[in-house]
From Swiss-Prot:
GO terms for cellular component: extracellular region. It comes from Drosophila persimilis. It is found in: Secreted. GO terms for molecular function: carboxylesterase activity. PROSITE patterns: CARBOXYLESTERASE_B_1 (PS00122), CARBOXYLESTERASE_B_2 (PS00941). This is Esterase-5B. The active site is at S207, H467. Keywords: Disulfide bond, Glycoprotein, Hydrolase, Secreted, Serine esterase, Signal.
Length: 545
């Protein structure tokens, strides 16, 4: 049904060749009416444009509905996008509630470049563990300075409002993924009105955004809305992306907010729709074992095959093995210390005792590890879970205790289990079952400050090249200092050129600086590009280093 809806929407496209009025580029015509953006010096912005009806009231916990309202006055597109309602890990203190339930918008940023009449497009799906974040969490000044690409940022439902699921057709889940999908359709339909090229759309994302991008690619009809895709430090096989146990969490959520009498999905859904959104989102605190662990209590699920408009009804591994996914060029990446998220959190000192969380891990490993590393719901028995916890500790720590001194070994464990291993598995499956080019790179060049320092709230630890150190050279983020080093400046420009050339390539070629990525499809070995401060190098490997 979802595919049929896509074809219907694609058949109704209203596409123009450029912004409506060349004499006034801030004024744009859409099927809904006229809108006016802002002049930002070297680019124009058109922000907070609704692509779906507000997901409130009866539309809460439903697939998004295309925005159909007509504007009688000129729409004010100068207001920055609001974040979707969330329990935000990066808000200090006990009250982490932020955002608004009415949030399904896209924001368009168009270069001032008189040398060209149209621009290729990069659509960005933000990260945040499917729980927090928003279109405004990353800056775009670096991105827009080159003047060659239109950027579109997508907002989508998060946390329980975006991903609660009972595992059946009545409360199927994946509403946030369906939001992203509708936003991509909106971009395909409307971007020409801003001077964008609907035939040249690249979709990228970082962390949960990267996992989202991969999940979008795993739908065969993704090729109708985009030409290529890149998943930075996140893919559909990461253990925190597609999870089990959603039904239990859905009914536990109901119990917390006063829907404990519900014994079936229909009753639960009706009751949850009647509750204030703030109560539903604030209930996230009850699913955290300590601090912000697990970092994704609500995320994507495999939906029931009979669910209306199901986004995915098979596990990603099975989808890839079937070959029934979009055959578009796709790249997947990781950093050498990606596991700094969320491992660095364990170095924070507890307000109550002054001890780091990592010290308490010695006594709580068997309790906490399944939540930290996302295998709590995938194990059949407690014994299986304990055996796996014991195996991991022995492999990475041996007989040593968890401490600040042994932190790097713990971070390596997090990197392998949460990011690197699943990146390698994804790459291996795609090279065996895909047809379009599949690429990969690893980034090793630590930022002076990054997400590690932000989580640990300390600057005396060297975290290495952590989660976001590459992506934040494309889109600024407050966790790192804004001033780039000279080597980072070069890498940033190479990344931007990489995106530009990738979306324009007719044969899916991908290059960074002087290095051309090697395609993994049909290769007997893994092809991995290594990017460091000294340049780039193609590696041919049996397994990731």
């Amino acid at each position: 049904m979802y595919c049929a809806k896509l074809i219907l929407l694609l058949g109704c496209f209203w596409i123009s060749s450029s912004a409506s009025d060349p004499a006034d580029p801030l004024l744009v015509d859409l099927p809904n009416g006229k809108l006016r953006g802002r002049d930002n010096g070297n680019y124009y912005s058109y922000e907070s444009l609704p692509y779906a009806e507000p997901p409130v009231g009866d539309l809460r916990f439903e697939a998004p509905q295309p925005y159909k309202q007509q504007w009688t006055d000129t729409f004010d597109a100068t207001q920055p996008p609001v974040s979707c309602m969330q329990w935000d890990q990066f808000i200090r203190g006990d009250d982490k509630l932020a955002g608004n339930e009415d949030c399904l918008t896209v924001s368009v940023y168009r270069p001032k470049n008189s040398s060209r009449n149209s621009f290729p497009v990069v659509a960005q799906i933000h990260g945040g563990a499917f729980m927090f974040g928003g279109a405004s969490q990353n800056g775009h000044e670096n991105f827009m300075r080159e003047g060659n690409l239109i950027l579109v940022k997508i907002s989508y439902r998060l946390g329980p409002l975006g991903f609660v699921s009972t595992g059946d057709a009545d409360l199927s889940g994946n509403f946030g993924l369906k939001d992203q999908r509708l936003a991509l359709l909106w971009i395909k339909q409307n971007i020409a009105s801003f001077g964008g090229e609907p035939e040249n759309i690249l979709v990228i994302g970082h962390s949960a955004g990267g996992g989202s991008v991969h999940l979008q690619v795993l739908r065969e009809d993704f090729s109708k809305v985009a030409k290529a895709a890149i998943s930075f430090s996140g893919n559909a096989l990461d253990p925190w992306v597609v999870q089990q146990g959603g039904r239990g969490r859905a009914f536990e959520l109901g119990r917390i907010v006063g829907c404990g009498q519900a014994s079936d999905s229909v009753t639960l859904k009706k009751c949850l729709k009647s509750k204030p959104a703030s109560e539903i989102v604030s209930a996230v605190r009850n699913f955290l074992v300590f601090a912000y662990v697990p970092f994704t209590p609500f995320g994507p699920v495999v939906e029931s095959p009979d669910a209306p408009e199901a986004f995915i009804s098979q596990h990603p591994v099975d989808i890839i093995k079937s070959g029934k996914f979009a055959q578009v060029p796709w790249a997947v990446t990781y950093t050498t210390e990606d596991g700094g998220y969320n491992a660095a959190l364990l170095l924070e000192e507890q307000a109550s005792s002054g001890r780091e969380w990592i010290v308490d891990l010695n006594d709580r490993w068997f309790d906490w590890a399944p939540y930290l590393l996302f295998y709590r719901d995938s194990m059949t028995t407690i014994k299986d879970m304990d055996d796996y916890s014991r195996k991991l500790r022995q492999e990475y720590l041996g007989d040593r205790r968890f401490s600040v001194e042994s932190y790097w070994d713990l971070q390596r464990l997090f990197t392998d289990v949460l990011f690197k291993n699943s990146t390698e598995i994804s790459l291996d499956l795609h090279r065996k079952h895909g047809k379009s080019p599949v690429y990969a790179f690893v980034y090793d060049n630590p930022a002076n400050t990054g997400i590690g320092q932000g989580l640990a709230q300390r600057t005396d630890i060297n975290f290495g090249t952590v989660h976001g150190d590459d992506y934040f050279l494309i889109f600024e983020n407050i966790v790192r200092e804004p001033q780039l080093r000279s080597d980072e400046e070069t890498i940033s420009r190479n990344f931007l050129k990489m995106l530009n050339d990738f979306v324009l390539s007719e044969n899916g070629t991908l290059a960074f600086g002087t290095c051309v990525f090697q395609d993994n499809v049909g290769s007997s070995k893994l092809q991995l590009l290594s990017i460091t401060r000294n340049g780039c190098e193609n590696l041919e490997l049996e397994s990731f280093p």
